[in-house]
Amino acid sequence: LEEFSASEQQLIIAQKDHSDWVHYAGNVLLIGPSGVGKSHIAAALASQLIEQNVRVKWFSALALVQTLQQAKRDLDLMIAMTRLDKYQVLVIDDIGYVKKSDAETQVLFEFIAHRYESGSLIITSNQPFSHWDQIFPDTMMTVAAIDRIIHHATIIEIEGDSYRRKQSLKN
C-alpha cells in the first residue's frame, strides 16, 4: 500500500472495509495510462477479498478472450461461462490493451452480459470509455458493454507518471 498515493490507499482500504459490492455483483474499474498501478491495485483488492474468503480468479483480457473463444469453437461457451460463475470476482486485466477480432469481442461481450448482476468484475484498462469503440466492433455493442459494466461500479481514474518509468530513472 505504501507505493500508492493517499487517495489510492484510501480506495483500497475502503474497498476492503466495504466489500458489500461483491455481494451485490458490483464492479470496480481502474482506468489510466500504462504504468500507473492499475494492475497492482487490482491485485491488492483481489488479495484482500481472498483474505475475506471471496473466490477470485485473475485473467489477462487476452487469456480470458482466448479461453472463451476456444469454448465457443468447441460449442461449450455457456458451460465455460457457467464454470466461471463459481468465482464471486473475476479480474480482467488490460481489457483495452490488445485489439481483438470481431469473434473475440463478441465472446467478451457475451461474457460481460452473462456476468451482469450475477458476479463482480475488477477491470483494468488503459483506454478511457471514449476509446472503447476500439475494443468492441460496433457502437451498439460498445454502449451496451459499458452500460452493463458501470451500472453497479466504482470507477477509479488514475493519473500520473508511470511507476516503471520513475523506477528506471532512479536506476
Task: Briefly describe each language-model feature range.
Residues 41, 45:
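Hydrophobic positions on the alpha1 helix immediately C-terminal to the Walker A/P-loop
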Residues 22-28:
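Pre-Walker A (Motif I) flank of P-loop NTPase domains
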Residues 31:
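Residues at the beta-strand->loop junction immediately N-terminal to the Walker
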Residues 34:
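The conserved Walker
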Residues 38:
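Conserved lysine of the Walker
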Residues 1-19:
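N-terminal pre-Walker A segment at the start of P-loop NTPase domains
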